Regions:
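Conserved, well-structured functional cores that handle cations and Mg-NTP chemistry
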Residues: 1-171
Length: 171
């Protein structure tokens, strides 16, 4: 299994302009596969028993210009199309979409908005501050068992304001 994972991850090497960035990509993927919680970069560091000094290096990796998320996404889509047993009905693949609202404590975090909760549970507040995530995946498998392989996930609303903060700098 490790050899298959290594071969799969090697397909992403051309997506990175620096060898070190690719090494951090492999580290992050391994951390995502093994982590026991969803606390971000600290989960990866803790579950892989990395030095606490790696925290800043991982943060830098996510802001690096040595890779482009669109190139990685297209490589992932290509690998799924070539290797995965895409489940089809009448020669058409099945796409699955969903959305979730994730509460955030920070009001001034990028992309955080006031969100209406559509719930019939009266113990939940009517509004929360958080992110609205949307995801789409493709159905993979055979008649005996199927699962959804993720294609893309992003914040659905609230980032337009963030992009306006990045005004050009005049010297």
């Amino acid at each position: 299994m490790f050899q298959q994972i290594e071969q799969l991850l090697a397909q992403f090497r051309p997506c990175f302009s620096r060898k070190a960035a690719f090494g951090w990509f492999v580290t992050v993927i391994a951390g995502f596969m093994l982590r026991g919680d969803h606390l971000g970069v600290t989960s990866v560091i803790r579950d892989l028993s990395l030095s606490p000094g790696c925290y800043e290096l991982l943060i830098h990796f996510f802001h690096s210009d040595a890779w482009d998320p669109d190139v990685i996404r297209k490589t992932w889509w290509k690998l799924l199309a070539e290797r995965a047993p895409v489940y089809r009905v009448k020669k058409r693949c099945i796409l699955i979409g969903d959305g979730v609202k994730q509460s955030k404590e920070a009001f001034h975090m990028a992309g955080v908005k006031k969100l209406l909760q559509e719930s019939e549970n009266s113990s939940k507040p009517r509004y929360i501050f958080g992110h609205m995530f949307g995801a789409v995946g493709i159905l993979i498998g055979r008649k005996g068992g199927k699962f959804c392989a993720p294609l893309q996930m992003n914040i659905q609303d609230g980032l337009r304001a963030v992009s306006s903060w990045m005004a050009p700098v005049f010297l």
